Amino acid sequence: MSFIAIIPARYASTRLPGKPLADIAGKPMVVHVMERALASGADRVIVATDHPDVVKAVEAAGGEVCLTRADHQSGTERLAEVIEHYGFADDDIIVNVQGDEPLVPPVIIRQVADNLAACSAGMATLAVPIASSEEAFNPNAVKVVMDAQGYALYFSRATIPWERERFAQSKETIGDCFLRHIGIYAYRAGFIRRYVNWAPSQLEQIELLEQLRVLWYGEKIHVAVAKAVPAVGVDTQSDLDRVRAIMLNQ
C-alpha cells in the first residue's frame, strides 16, 4: 500500500523560534523527522515549510521540500497547498507527520496509513491508553472516545468518558476506558481539499481542537490504538533538552 508523508515545519514557533532547525545529535530536528518518515516505508516524504533556511537544511540532507506560504493557520492548510502544488490524486493517502516529533516511531506512520486504506473514512488517527488519573484529568492530554466500529465519537480536553460511580467515590484511580489522542493523521487528498473549504466550527473554537471540525460536518475519523507509544514531542526548550538526552543515550 502506497502513501505520501508530508511534514509541516513552521519556522516561527512562539516558544522555540527556529524549532525545525534545532540541533539534535548533530542534525536539524526536521531531518530526524524526515528520516523516521522514510523508515516507515512511505513512497515519498516531503517537508512543507515557510522558511528558506529549512529548505536549505532539508536539501542538504538529500530530502524533498516544498516552500509554502507563511500565512497558513494550521498544518492542514499547509498540507493542502502541497497537495495542490504537486497535483496529487484525490485517492492518494497522505500522512501528516508532525515536524516537532523527532522520536516518532516509524511503525505508527505506516499503521495510520494502512488503517485509512482499510476503511471508508476520509481521515484516520491513533490513540494510546491512559494509565494515570493525572493524565486523565490533564486538559493538555486530549481524550477520544470511539464507537463499536472504531470511529471517533468525540475528542475533548475534558475527562471523557466520565466514570460516574468510580469518580463519585474517588478520582485517585481510573478504569481502562481512557484513550489519549496522538497527533498523527492520515487523509485522502480529496478529503483535505474539502476540509479547507469548511468554516471553523464552534466546537473546535471552544476546545481548540482542529479535528472537531471534521465531526461537526458529519465526516468520520477512524481511530486505532497505536502499535508504539511516541516519546516526547518538542514544544519548549525543556522538551528539546529531554529529546537531546534521549538521543544521546540511543
UniProtKB/Swiss-Prot annotation:
- Involved pathway(s): Nucleotide-sugar biosynthesis; CMP-3-deoxy-D-manno-octulosonate biosynthesis; CMP-3-deoxy-D-manno-octulosonate from 3-deoxy-D-manno-octulosonate and CTP: step 1/1; Bacterial outer membrane biogenesis; lipopolysaccharide biosynthesis
Known EC number: 2.7.7.38
Give any GO molecular function from the UniProt entry: 3-deoxy-manno-octulosonate cytidylyltransferase activity
**A GO term (biological process) for this protein?**
lipopolysaccharide biosynthetic process
- Keyword annotations from UniProtKB, A to Z: Cytoplasm, Lipopolysaccharide biosynthesis, Nucleotidyltransferase, Transferase
Which SUPFAM superfamilies does this entry report, sorted A to Z?
Answer: Nucleotide-diphospho-sugar transferases (SSF53448)
Q: Which reaction does it catalyse?
A: 3-deoxy-alpha-D-manno-oct-2-ulosonate + CTP = CMP-3-deoxy-beta-D-manno-octulosonate + diphosphate
Under the cellular component aspect of Gene Ontology, which terms does the record hold?
cytosol
Annotated coiled-coil segments of the chain: none
**Gene3D superfamilies registered for this protein in UniProt:** Spore Coat Polysaccharide Biosynthesis Protein SpsA, Chain A
Q: Where in the cell is it found?
A: Cytoplasm
**First-listed, main subcellular location of the protein, grouped into a coarse class:** cytoplasm
Q: Quick one: signal sequence residues?
A: none
Q: Which NCBIfam families match?
A: kdsB, PRK05450.1-3, PRK05450.1-5, PRK13368.1
The similarity comment for this entry is: Belongs to the KdsB family.
HAMAP family reported in the protein's UniProt record: KdsB
Function noted in UniProt: Activates KDO (a required 8-carbon sugar) for incorporation into bacterial lipopolysaccharide in Gram-negative bacteria.
The name of this protein is 3-deoxy-manno-octulosonate cytidylyltransferase
Q: Which species does this protein come from?
A: Yersinia pestis
High-level lineage: Bacteria, Pseudomonadati, Pseudomonadota, Gammaproteobacteria, Enterobacterales
